[in-house]
C-alpha cells in the first residue's frame, strides 16, 4: 500500500474510535455534554464507519453493561471468559437476561434525536457508503489500487478499530480495577 493509504487508514481508525468514545459513549450514552447538529452528524458518520451498530442500539447495550456489569445481564460479561468478552458475545444469541434488562433501559432521549433516527433508519445503507468513501479517497486522490484501498482503508481499518474497542470489554474487565457503580448509567 502507498504510504498515504496507510496514513489514511490510521486517521480514519482514529476518527471512528473518537466517534465511538466521544460521541456514542460520552455524549450520547452518558450525556456528558451536548453538541450542535453538525458535530452530532460528524460523530454519527464516524460511529457508522466503526460498524458497532447504530448509536441507539450501541448505547442501550452500553447502559445495560454499566447497570449490570459482569453479570448475566451484561452483554459482554467477562465471567463467561476472555474470548466471550472480547468478541464471542457477538457470535451467539444474547443471554435472556441481556434482553430482559435491555427492555428496562429508557432510550427516549436518544430516540428523540433526529440525527440518530436517521442513522437507525438508514444504517444498512450508510455502512456500505462509508466503505465506498474509505476506498474512494485513496483511489481518487493518489491513484491507489482499488483492492488495496478497500482492504487497507476499509477492512484492515475496521479490524484494528474493532479489536481496540473490544479490548476494553475483555482486557480492561479481566485485568483492570473495578470501581464501577451499578447505580450509575
Q: Where are these predicted regions, by residue range?
A:
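Non-catalytic, topology-defining segments of multipass membrane proteins
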Residues: 1-166
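Active-site-proximal inter-transmembrane loops
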Residues: 107-114, 175-185
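C-terminal accessory segments of proteins
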Residues: 161-179
